[in-house]
């Protein structure tokens, strides 16, 4: 009995002490309240009291107090999210180690030193990444969030190498005594500093263009196994889903929207092509490619093609119309021949070695060889603009394969895959517009004729080389002339003179003059 009374008094003093301690310490009220609540609960449990209220935790933010179960769930949810982020970071770290280990090994997992150069390994890594991410982009629809996040994450890994490709630049440093001293500091290389942000912007524009088709509902796609697919399937694009448009065609708003997106993608395509062409131009020509070239331009082009290029009055559009370009293989072969002849003529104009004294070298003057080289470069430029999705030429492949500049390798591969993606999106937009044109018959014969005339405009018409129109005007003017033979003779002397190709170009410079 006495022991129970002493225990009860001790409990009372302890509770009184805790109450005074809580009132005296105002700076840590939350912690003391929790301690008082816990100790009070223990005291009441010791004295056999079961009327105490359940323990509650006050949330720091304003709002009703959470019960023990709700607080536990919130803590567990936050803990699970933190663990998920940690697991994702570990997975990304392992993936990054795998990627860069392959780059360091040069794609030679045996480690025997037989791998490719760092530049080629990085170029192949960017190309393979784009193929795995954009290879299934066959419709005008947004990219899945998972693929988009993977592309952004892994391309940033590969592009991060360019942050450490630097060059020395002069700078001013102010000393403690107030004097200025010129020092050399490092900065990112100029070509990378200018082109990498531009390519990232083009990349974002292409992905945003695909995102703009998220809410469209006027056209859809039919799979190749669908019963709605008619028999008029184009076998040349059998792997691409067929576009289905409404019977009355697309609305005018949809046509304007598609045309606007097409114009935007076309600008991206032109910018990517320009960067890629500039980088390829700056790459060194491998010695192995030079050794494989024939002796002269005639041997590279062939007799008939050489004759068409070296005529007195040259029209590039007429030259291309005389070539057989019915397949991609023939177009690439034409590019290879043209590029080889350009390299041969350039080397003969620049280098004066023992080969220049050969009998065949004395037949063409330096001025004529320069004219032939400009004509060949014009043909090559037209081919690249007319067939942007064509395969790479032998010269481009050789430059990429033997290139040792890491910065140029990144710029070339990144611009090339953006060029390929832009061309793919442009083709998908053209598929929808073509399905719309084929689906409705709203065009009158006059409108169809106007479209044919616009679509058949040649390069000669665009550049002002209207030889046929000049000839027709000459015939019309001759009908109204008197029968004076002197006047006719003067007219024939004036009108039969054709402007040469170089004079017609005027201020347009060749690619060699720009560099």
From Swiss-Prot:
Localization, UniProt: Cytoplasm; Cell membrane
InterPro entries registered for this protein in UniProt: PRONE_dom, RopGEF
GO cellular component: cytoplasm; plasma membrane; pollen tube
Provenance organism: Arabidopsis thaliana
Described purpose of this protein according to its UniProt entry: Guanine-nucleotide exchange factor (GEF) that acts as an activator of Rop (Rho of plants) GTPases by promoting the exchange of GDP for GTP. May be recruited by PRK2 at the plasma membrane to maintain polar Rop activity in the pollen tube and control polarized pollen tube growth.
Domain comment, as recorded: The PRONE (plant-specific Rop nucleotide exchanger) domain is responsible for the GEF activity.
Regulation: Phosphorylation at Ser-510 by PRK2 may release ROPGEF12 auto-inhibition, thereby activating ROPGEF12 and downstream Rop signaling.
Transmembrane annotation, as ranges: none
Subunit organization: Interacts (via C-terminus) with PRK2. Interacts with PRK6.
GO MF, any single term: guanyl-nucleotide exchange factor activity
Keywords, alphabetical: Cell membrane, Cytoplasm, Guanine-nucleotide releasing factor, Membrane, Phosphoprotein
Ranges where the PRONE domain occurs: 83-446
A single BP term in Gene Ontology: regulation of pollen tube growth
Protein name as annotated: Rop guanine nucleotide exchange factor 12
């Amino acid at each position: 009995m006495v022991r129970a009374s002493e225990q009860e008094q001790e409990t009372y003093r302890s509770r009184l002490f805790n109450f005074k301690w809580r009132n005296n310490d105002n700076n840590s009220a939350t912690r003391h309240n929790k301690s008082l609540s816990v100790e009070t609960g223990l005291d009441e449990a010791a004295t056999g009291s079961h009327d105490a209220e359940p323990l509650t935790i006050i949330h720091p933010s304003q709002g009703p107090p959470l019960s023990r179960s709700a607080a536990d769930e919130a803590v567990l949810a936050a803990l699970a999210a933190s663990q998920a982020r940690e697991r994702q970071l570990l997975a990304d770290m392992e993936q990054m180690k795998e990627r860069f280990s392959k780059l360091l090994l040069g794609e030679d997992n045996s480690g025997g030193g037989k791998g490719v150069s760092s530049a080629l390994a990085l170029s192949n890594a960017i190309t393979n990444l784009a193929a795995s991410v954009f290879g299934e982009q066959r419709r005008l629809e947004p990219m899945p969030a998972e693929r988009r996040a993977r592309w952004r994450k892994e391309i940033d890994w590969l592009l991060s190498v360019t942050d450490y490709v630097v060059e020395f630049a002069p700078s001013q440093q102010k000393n403690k005594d107030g004097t200025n001293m010129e020092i050399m500091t490092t900065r990112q290389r100029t070509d990378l500093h200018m082109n990498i942000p531009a390519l990232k912007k083009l990349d974002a524009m292409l992905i945003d263009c695909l995102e703009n088709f998220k809410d469209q509902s006027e056209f859809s796609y039919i799979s190749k196994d669908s019963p709605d697919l008619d028999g008029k399937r184009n076998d040349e694009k059998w792997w691409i889903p067929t576009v289905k448009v409404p019977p009355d065609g697309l609305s005018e708003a949809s046509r304007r929207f598609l045309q606007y997106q097409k114009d935007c993608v076309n600008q991206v395509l032109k910018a990517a092509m320009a960067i890629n062409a500039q980088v390829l131009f700056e790459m060194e020509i491998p010695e192995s490619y030079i050794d494989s070239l024939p002796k002269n331009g005639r041997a590279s082009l062939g007799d008939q093609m050489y004759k068409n290029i070296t005529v007195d009055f040259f029209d590039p559009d007429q030259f291309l119309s005389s070539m057989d370009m019915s397949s991609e293989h023939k177009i690439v072969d034409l590019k290879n021949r043209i590029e080889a002849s350009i390299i041969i003529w350039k080397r003969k104009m620049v280098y004066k070695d023992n080969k220049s004294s050969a009998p065949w070298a004395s037949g063409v003057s330096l001025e004529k060889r320069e004219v032939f080289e400009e004509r060949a470069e014009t043909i090559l430029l037209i081919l690249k603009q007319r067939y942007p999705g064509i395969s790479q030429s032998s010269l481009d492949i050789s430059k990429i394969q033997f290139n040792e500049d890491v910065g140029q390798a990144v710029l070339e591969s990144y611009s090339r895959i953006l060029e390929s993606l832009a061309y793919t999106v442009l083709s998908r937009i053209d598929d929808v517009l073509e399905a719309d044109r084929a689906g409705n018959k709203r065009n009158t014969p006059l409108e169809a004729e106007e479209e044919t005339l616009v679509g058949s405009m040649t390069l000669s018409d665009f550049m002002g080389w209207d030889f046929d129109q000049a000839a027709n005007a000459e015939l019309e003017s001759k009908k109204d002339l008197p029968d004076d033979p002197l006047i006719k003779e003067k007219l024939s002397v004036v009108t039969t003179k054709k402007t040469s190709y170089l004079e017609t170009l005027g201020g347009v410079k060749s690619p060699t003059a720009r560099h």
